[in-house]
């Protein structure tokens, strides 16, 4: 599975069954939630110095007596490891300091003592620096922790607002489309209130996920734009529910969510028909 860091500094590939999980700020954590075999973490740092990456490797080799120079794929690294005990179980943490140009990476892989670190080395081999100013094609990747947080925040605001204004429950089912529409049509929100309209779009998107099997949240990276969207069974059917609502409101066009739901459902059914043929 491909991962592109927020801001587009780097990309990497991680195993299909692995997922990204919330971690400390500026650190990205990946592991298999169903069959845990270790935690892989990566942090990236950028500096104005063009040889910053090499400086970091040299510094690690100088200051850490247990570090040694190794090659992982095309990457020069300073590698070290340590073994520790936690709650009666022994673990080993492997560390790599990697650098190139003005970027430095710190990677770690913590797993039970005696475990195989090759999966972490494969991830490091896949690591690529995305060049500043280079035009990359639009990519769709599994939804990142960043966008999950944005979706949750937007949905929480929209659902709370709808329940407060209508004094009705909101369970993210098809029947709730009318409630979103009622609040959108109430005149309480002005076209320039982008956050509100996009949040209503996210709430609509949540209904699409709940009502259409195979519809899932993804992250779209398109140049400098990075946003949550919906993709149907890995097909070309891609929906940006936040933009769907806000762009219509901004252009003073009618936004009928029931009609949009029916349209998207037809398109999803057409995708399934194509897959069967």
Question: Predicted segment positions?
Answer:
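Secretory pathway targeting signatures of secreted, lumenal, and periplasmic proteins
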Residues: 2-55, 59
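N-terminal low-complexity, intrinsically disordered segments
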Residues: 137-195
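Signature of long, low-cysteine stretches enriched in small and polar/charged residues
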Residues: 56-104, 110-113
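Surface-exposed amphipathic alpha-helical segments
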Residues: 16-18, 105-138
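Amphipathic protein-protein interaction modules
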Residues: 92, 195-248
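Short, charged/polar micro-motifs that form catalytic or ligand-binding hotspots
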Residues: 113, 170, 190-198, 235, ...
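Short secondary-structure junctions
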Residues: 16-23, 61-73, 214-217
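A recognition module on extended beta-rich or small alphabeta surfaces enriched in W/G with H and D/E
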Residues: 229-277
């Amino acid at each position: 599975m491909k991962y592109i860091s927020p801001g587009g500094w780097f990309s990497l590939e991680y195993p299909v069954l692995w997922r990204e999980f919330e971690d400390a700020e500026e650190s990205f954590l990946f592991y298999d939630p169903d069959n845990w075999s270790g935690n892989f973490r990566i942090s990236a740092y950028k500096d104005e110095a063009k040889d910053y990456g090499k400086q970091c490797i040299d510094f690690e080799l100088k200051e850490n007596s247990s570090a040694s120079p190794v090659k992982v794929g095309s990457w020069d690294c300073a590698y070290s490891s340590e073994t520790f005990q936690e709650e009666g179980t022994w673990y080993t943490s492997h560390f790599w300091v990697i650098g190139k140009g003005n970027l430095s990476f710190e990677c770690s892989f913590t797993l039970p003592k005696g475990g195989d670190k090759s999966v972490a080395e494969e991830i490091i081999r896949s690591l690529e620096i995305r060049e500043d100013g280079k035009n990359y094609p639009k990519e769709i990747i599994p939804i990142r922790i960043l966008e999950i947080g944005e979706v949750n925040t937007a949905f929480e605001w929209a659902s709370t607002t709808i329940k407060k204004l209508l004094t009705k429950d909101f369970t993210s089912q098809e029947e709730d489309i009318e409630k979103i529409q009622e609040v959108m049509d109430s005149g309480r929100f002005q076209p320039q209130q982008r956050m509100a309209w996009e949040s209503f779009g996210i709430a609509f998107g949540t209904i699409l996920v709940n009502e259409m099997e195979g519809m899932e949240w993804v992250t779209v990276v398109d140049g400098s734009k990075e946003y949550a969207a919906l993709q149907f069974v890995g097909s070309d059917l891609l929906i940006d529910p936040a933009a769907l609502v806000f762009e219509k409101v901004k252009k003073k066009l009618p936004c009928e969510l029931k009609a949009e739901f029916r349209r998207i459902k037809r398109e999803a059914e057409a995708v399934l028909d194509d897959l069967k043929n």
